[in-house]
Amino acid sequence: MPRYKLTIEYDGAPFCGWQLQPVLPSVQGALEAAALATCGEAVRVHGAGRTDAGVHALGQVAHLDIAKPFRADRLRDALNAHVRPYPVAVLSTEIVPDSFEARFSAIRRHYRYRIVNRRSNLALEIGKVWRVPKPLDTDAMHRAAQVLIGKHDFTTFRDTECQAASPEKTLDVLDVVRSGDCVDIITSARSYLHSQVRSMVGSLVWVGEGRWSADDLAAALAARRRSACGPVAPPDGLYLVKVDY
């Protein structure tokens, strides 16, 4: 049975997240319905990252097995035809070995969090960025972010309902970059805890606003207590950019 790797882009706003839910619309559910319409069989679509409600993707990766063989480009086109009207696009498909697993074969996941730092309201990017009206010291944010690099117990920065067996993760990259009013927080790691990226972003915004210092961020990390975390950033600005294998 051929296995196909999909690279997918989506707007997370109308979905309850990636993961299939009984009633609410999910990205996984939309793709599985498209696969059923394409090949006439129930197919499970496995994603590399289980993004939360409202979180977007530029390069989510998934795999699926289909009994009927398809040319990769024809499968892509058929899935795109059937996934409408959802804001989901299958960017590419390729045949991969049976040993490939979208989630477990991944060696690194890259996320970007987009902030617009201005007092004026959003007009064109509502639901796509987090508008922070108070001026942010992005140099201070970047310096503080380096406290979180490396292997740590990230209990402070994970959701209380996170089901991961261990709170330890290794963060490879956490950069804060400004271009005019736009502030990007870029992070890379093999894997993350539930709500970890948004929790780190919210705490870094407190640093940028002058509410916290780098030492305060370090103390929050060391506390290993969820209540020590700063605010959790909204999902609007978070994008799964790329998955490495």
Swiss-Prot record:
Annotated catalysed reactions: uridine(38/39/40) in tRNA = pseudouridine(38/39/40) in tRNA
Swiss-Prot/TrEMBL keywords: Isomerase, tRNA processing
InterPro entries per the UniProt record, alphabetical: PsdUridine_synth_cat_dom_sf (IPR020103), PsdUridine_synth_TruA (IPR001406), PsdUridine_synth_TruA_a/b_dom (IPR020097), PsdUridine_synth_TruA_C (IPR020095), TruA/RsuA/RluB/E/F_N (IPR020094)
Matches recorded under SUPFAM superfamilies: Pseudouridine synthase
One GO-annotated biological process of the protein: tRNA pseudouridine synthesis
Pfam families according to UniProt: PseudoU_synth_1
Residues annotated to bind substrate: 111
Residues of the active site: 52 (nucleophile)
Highest taxon of the lineage: Bacteria
Enzyme Commission designation: 5.4.99.12
GO-annotated molecular function: RNA binding; tRNA pseudouridine(38-40) synthase activity
Record family assignment: Belongs to the tRNA pseudouridine synthase TruA family.
Quaternary structure, from the entry: Homodimer.
Purpose: Formation of pseudouridine at positions 38, 39 and 40 in the anticodon stem and loop of transfer RNAs.
Matches recorded under NCBIfam families: hisT_truA
Stated name of the protein: tRNA pseudouridine synthase A
